[in-house]
C-alpha cells in the first residue's frame, strides 16, 4: 500500500479574543497602534485578526512591507479596499474606475506636481503662511493641529484650485472640508452609505463643493480667463477617447489631490513642531541653516528649500515616528504566501508605518528621536526601499509627499522667523478617534 503526503500549508497565527463578529473593530478605532503592536510582539511579522466579519492579515517589517507593496493589483487591490472614498471623490474617480482610467486620471494630476509648478507653489505657500501667522498677534496660545489644518487648507486651495477660489475662501469651505473628512472613519470602510448624520453631512458637503467649483469654471469660461493652475489643466484635459471631464469629475480630481496634499501636510507640520520643541538641541542647527540659505530674504526658492537638509531630516524623523498614514489596506483577491504562511483570498491585508517604523530591525533605537539617522553616512531609511513607508511605497506611493515636505519647510521657515515657540505641555499623544 502506498500513501501520498498531503501538503497542508499553515495559515498565519490568529490574535485571539475580540467581540463576536466585530472582532477588534472597537479597539482598532480607539488605539489601532497599540493593538497592532501587541500582535507584532506576540507573533512577529505576520498574524491575523477579525475585523467586522472580515479576516485581516497584518504584515510588518521591511520584508513584509515589500511583499505588500509589490503584490500585483490583481492580487492585492486598492480599489476594493478604498470604496469609502467614492462618496467623497465621486463616481468614476480614482478607486471607482478601471485601472486604465485611473492611470489617465493620474496623468492629469502629475503635471500639478512638476518642478515648475512646485516653484510657483513655494511663493504661494510663503504668502499664505505669512498672512496666517500675522493674525496670531505678538503672543498667545494656539491649538497647533487645528492651526495647521486651517493653514494647509488655505495653501492647498491656493496652489491646487486657484486664486479665485482662495480669494473667496470663507469659513464655509473649511466647514465643507471638515464634513468631507468626517465621512472617513472605520465604519465608512465597511458601510459607507449608511444613513448616518456624518455621512449625510459628507454627501451634502460634496454637492455644495461641486456647486462652488462649477461656478468658478463658469466664470472663467464666460470671461475668457485662463488660469495657470491645476483647475485650468483639468478644464482643458481630455481622456484618450477625446471625452472632456465633467464638472463633477473635475471636482473629484481636485478633492483627490487636495486630500493627498492637505491632510498629510497638516499632520506632518504639527508633529514636526512638537517633536523639535521636545528636543530643542536640534533647533540651533536648523535656524543657522535657514539663515545661511535665505538670510533676510522674504522669498523662498525651490532650490533654497532643497538646501534645508537639517530641517528635512527632522521632517523625515517626524514621518517615521508620527506618520501621517498609520494604516494601509488592500483587498486580497488571490491567495498569497509569505514566509511559509498561506493567506486565503477574500480578506484584507494591512501594513502600518507607525508599527513598522518602531522595529529595531528597521531602525536603530527606533523609539529615540534622532534626525541624524538620515545623514548620508547613516542613511537608515535606505536599508530597504520599504523601511520608511510613511507615505506608502511602491507604485502606489502617495503622490502628495513632495508637496507635503515642501509645505512643511515653508511653514517652519516663516514660523521661526516670526515667533519664539514653547510647548504648553511636554507630553502629547496621537488621538485616533
Regions picked out by a protein language model, each given a short descriptive name:
Residues 152, 156, 206-216, 237-292, ...:
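Central I-helix of cytochrome P450 enzymes
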Residues 34, 66-85, 363:
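Cytochrome P450 catalytic domain signature, combining two hallmark sequence patches
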Residues 64-65, 356:
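A generic structural signal for short hydrophobic patches within well-formed alpha-helices
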Residues 11-21, 122, 126, 175-176, ...:
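Cytochrome P450 I-helix active-site segment
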Residues 280-282, 403-433:
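Cytochrome P450 heme-binding "Cys pocket" and the immediately downstream C-terminal segment
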Residues 351-379:
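Conserved cytochrome P450 K-helix/beta-meander segment immediately N-terminal to the heme-binding cysteine loop
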Residues 164-165, 182-186, 217-228, 243, ...:
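Proline-centered turn/helix-capping motifs that create local helix->coil transitions or kinks
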Residues 9-37, 41, 55, 62-63, ...:
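Cytochrome P450 catalytic-domain helical core, especially the substrate-recognition surface
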Amino acid at each position: 500500500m502506498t500513501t501520498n503526503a498531503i501538503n497542508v500549508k499553515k495559515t498565519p497565527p490568529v490574535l485571539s479574543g475580540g467581540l463576536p463578529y466585530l472582532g477588534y473593530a472597537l479597539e482598532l478605532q480607539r488605539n489601532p497602534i497599540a493593538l497592532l503592536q501587541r500582535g507584532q510582539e506576540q507573533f512577529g511579522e505576520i498574524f491575523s485578526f477579525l475585523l467586522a466579519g472580515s479576516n485581516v492579515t497584518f504584515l510588518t517589517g521591511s520584508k513584509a512591507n515589500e511583499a505588500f507593496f509589490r503584490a500585483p493589483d490583481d492580487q492585492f487591490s486598492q480599489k476594493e479596499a478604498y470604496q469609502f472614498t467614492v462618496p467623497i471623490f465621486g463616481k468614476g474617480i480614482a478607486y471607482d474606475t478601471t485601472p486604465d482610467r485611473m492611470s489617465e486620471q493620474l496623468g492629469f494630476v502629475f503635471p500639478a506636481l512638476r518642478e515648475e509648478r512646485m516653484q510657483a507653489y513655494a511663493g504661494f505657500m510663503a504668502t499664505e503662511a505669512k498672512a496666517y501667522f500675522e493674525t496670531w498677534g505678538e503672543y498667545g496660545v494656539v491649538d497647533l493641529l487645528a492651526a495647521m489644518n486651517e493653514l494647509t487648507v488655505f495653501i492647498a486651495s491656493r496652489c491646487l484650485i486657484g486664486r479665485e477660489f482662495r480669494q473667496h475662501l470663507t469659513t464655509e469651505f473649511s466647514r465643507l472640508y471638515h464634513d468631507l473628512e468626517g465621512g472617513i472613519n472605520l465604519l465608512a470602510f465597511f458601510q459607507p452609505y449608511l444613513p448616518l448624520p456624518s455621512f449625510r453631512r459628507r454627501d451634502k458637503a460634496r454637492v455644495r463643493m461641486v456647486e462652488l467649483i462649477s461656478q468658478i469654471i463658469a466664470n472663467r469660461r464666460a470671461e475668457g480667463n485662463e488660469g495657470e493652475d491645476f483647475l485650468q489643466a483639468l478644464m482643458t484635459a481630455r481622456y484618450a477617447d477625446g471625452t472632456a471631464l465633467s464638472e463633477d469629475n473635475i471636482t473629484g480630481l481636485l478633492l483627490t489631490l487636495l486630500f493627498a496634499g492637505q491632510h498629510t501636510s497638516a499632520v506632518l507640520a504639527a508633529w514636526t513642531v512638537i517633536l523639535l520643541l521636545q528636543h530643542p538641541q536640534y533647533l540651533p542647527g536648523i535656524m543657522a541653516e535657514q539663515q545661511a540659505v535665505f538670510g533676510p530674504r522674504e522669498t523662498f526658492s525651490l532650490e533654497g528649500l532643497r538646501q534645508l537638509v537639517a530641517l528635512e531630516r527632522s521632517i523625515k524623523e517626524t514621518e517615521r515616528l508620527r506618520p501621517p498614514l498609520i494604516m494601509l489596506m488592500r483587498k486580497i483577491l488571490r491567495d498569497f504566501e509569505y514566509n511559509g504562511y498561506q493567506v486565503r483570498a477574500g480578506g484584507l491585508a494591512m501594513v502600518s508605518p507607525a508599527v513598522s517604523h518602531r522595529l529595531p530591525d528597521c531602525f536603530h533605537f527606533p523609539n529615540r528621536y534622532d534626525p541624524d539617522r538620515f545623514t548620508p553616512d547613516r542613511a537608515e531609511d535606505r536599508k530597504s526601499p520599504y523601511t520608511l513607508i510613511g507615505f506608502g511605497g511602491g507604485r502606489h506611493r502617495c503622490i502628495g509627499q513632495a508637496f507635503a515636505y515642501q509645505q512643511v519647510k515653508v511653514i517652519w521657515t516663516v514660523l521661526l522667523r516670526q515667533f519664539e515657540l514653547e510647548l504648553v505641555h511636554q507630553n502629547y499623544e496621537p488621538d485616533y478617534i
